[in-house]
Amino acid sequence: MAADYDKLFRPHEGMEAPDDMAAQPFFDPSASFPPAPASANLPKPNGQTPPPTSDDLSERFVSAPPPPPPPPPPPPPTPMPIAAGEPPSPEPAASKPPTPPMPIAGPEPAPPKPPTPPMPIAGPEPAPPKPPTPPMPIAGPAPTPTESQLAPPRPPTPQTPTGAPQQPESPAPHVPSHGPHQPRRTAPAPPWAKMPIGEPPPAPSRPSASPAEPPTRPAPQHSRRARRGHRYRTDTERNVGKVATGPSIQARLRAEEASGAQLAPGTEPSPAPLGQPRSYLAPPTRPAPTEPPPSPSPQRNSGRRAERRVHPDLAAQHAAAQPDSITAATTGGRRRKRAAPDLDATQKSLRPAAKGPKVKKVKPQKPKATKPPKVVSQRGWRHWVHALTRINLGLSPDEKYELDLHARVRRNPRGSYQIAVVGLKGGAGKTTLTAALGSTLAQVRADRILALDADPGAGNLADRVGRQSGATIADVLAEKELSHYNDIRAHTSVNAVNLEVLPAPEYSSAQRALSDADWHFIADPASRFYNLVLADCGAGFFDPLTRGVLSTVSGVVVVASVSIDGAQQASVALDWLRNNGYQDLASRACVVINHIMPGEPNVAVKDLVRHFEQQVQPGRVVVMPWDRHIAAGTEISLDLLDPIYKRKVLELAAALSDDFERAGRR
């Protein structure tokens, strides 16, 4: 069933306005005439009609009682009368002002509080520091200041000017309202104390001497480094050292001393700047009170330089008496020339620790031992590899062993070292061995070496070394004195490796045999001019020349052939040396087993070596092979010798050289 909307929204009977009321115009509140009365035939509305209200909001609150006004501020105290004899006149009590009406907007807001001064950025204002110590006068210490002088100066008491105008009353704030205007009345301000006009000012309660103004501080003069800051310091260290870069106290004292300005007796020197910490200022020293010296008159050239010129001793004392903190302040960023004294525990605790960048300590690197370059091999397959590929494989073990033998041969003997080549049987190869041994020593050592033919039975040493001169030992014995090297060199012959040889006299033309005295006459000067002397002795030990040789030599070589009888004779020679007072020669003796014939011998060489190793030191038994060049019987040349034979001769020379540092000339 559909709803009947016309019936639902139809007004009730009697609620519709009549036609004449609907035609009434809109009420105008600003009209100057009253509205027309309603017609009598209008229907009476339901309920009671509320009384008419006024549109003026101010009339609504007039009937309400106004709130009590705030209490007036208490009057200021009556000032002290300036005239001493005139009592203060009593002021009439101020009449209580009428209560002002309550404003429409509510109670009057409280007056704003004065703004709080802003907190300084650097923190609360520090307490005024103690005044710095005045400079030490030239003639002596200054008097001790009293406590009143050490106290900071009090600000002067402001005096009320005569005939000051009275403070005008502040007008009451204007409060707009739609109601009747009622001005707000404020409490009258208390009147100012009357000042007597035309009378002298009364005596003040405080001393009339007002503190003099502090002397003007000169502009801080700093070096360019101080203004720029220290480039090697961190931020923490720069904050610590502000006292040195700020206005220095010593500079101000110098300026006052140079200008001749003197402070008033009641004043004190100006305190340190507020931006500087007080803990870094040295405490004032109180010297013993003495009579103050007369202040010198200001001169043209005043200051520290003038004081040093006039009183050098006092200037030195004055410089020593100044605290280090003031000196640090004057130097600024400059480097201190003298070490500062140790600070006390308080100053050390206040000074922050310097936190600079951590520098890693670099340990000095020790120079690494560089290995010597490899020596290029001169023979064998290593030599061919280096020649074809330029790859250096170093020396072979055989070449290293040969270099070690050369190093042993090059040892320096203690004085002159003489070597005797002996044997009990002729034909064992003593002469050839002496020539080969001497040539090897001369080639390796490259110094003066002399080979003497001491065989009384027609020796041929000069023929195997190489004869160049016809002179013999007999010609040297004919000299009256052998004091120079050339006295011997004039009679010797030299081969290709610089080995000198002095042959024996010709057996066919000899008048007599050589004696031990003849040997000493030649051997003594030869030991002064030659480092090594070799003697080729004959068979046996009983001839006087061989006895003379054994009395001066330091080493001996016993030669034996590869045979049973040759080995037996070599053993007998060693026993004879031990039994006849040559034990030292027998202990250092070398045994040479010489192959004088080609082919295999009829005895075992190893058995002979084992036999002689039991009588001499290890490594002093050398087996010499048969060599074709040696068997030819001509002049011996090292280049024509077999490499094996040359190696055995080198080993013999190295074995004899081991005693160069232990045994000297006999």
UniProtKB/Swiss-Prot annotation:
GO molecular function: ATP binding; ATP hydrolysis activity
Entry-linked Pfam families: CbiA
Knockout-associated phenotype: Double espI-eccD1 mutants abolish EsxA and EsxB secretion, but not their expression. One group has shown no growth in the human macrophage-like cell line THP-1, no cytotoxicity, attenutated infection in mice, nearly 100-fold less bacteria in lung and spleen of C57BL/6; Brodin et al., attribute this result to polar effects on the downstream gene. Another group has shown that inactivation does not abolish EsxA (ESAT-6) secretion, EsxA-specific immunogenicity or virulence.
Listed Basic and acidic residues bias regions: 1-15
UniProt: ATP binding residues: L424, K425, G426, G427, A428, G429, K430, T431
Residue stretches of biased makeup (Pro residues): 64-80, 87-144, 188-205, 284-297
GO CC list: cytoplasmic side of plasma membrane; cytosol; plasma membrane
Gene3D superfamilies: P-loop containing nucleotide triphosphate hydrolases
Residue span of region Disordered: 1-378
Biological-process GO terms, alphabetical: protein secretion by the type VII secretion system
Superkingdom field: Bacteria
Subunit structure: Residues 1-81 interact with EsxB while residues 35-186 interact with an artificial EsxB-EsxA heterodimer.
Protein name, UniProt field: ESX-1 secretion-associated protein EspI
Lineage, uppermost ranks: Bacteria, Bacillati, Actinomycetota, Actinomycetes, Mycobacteriales
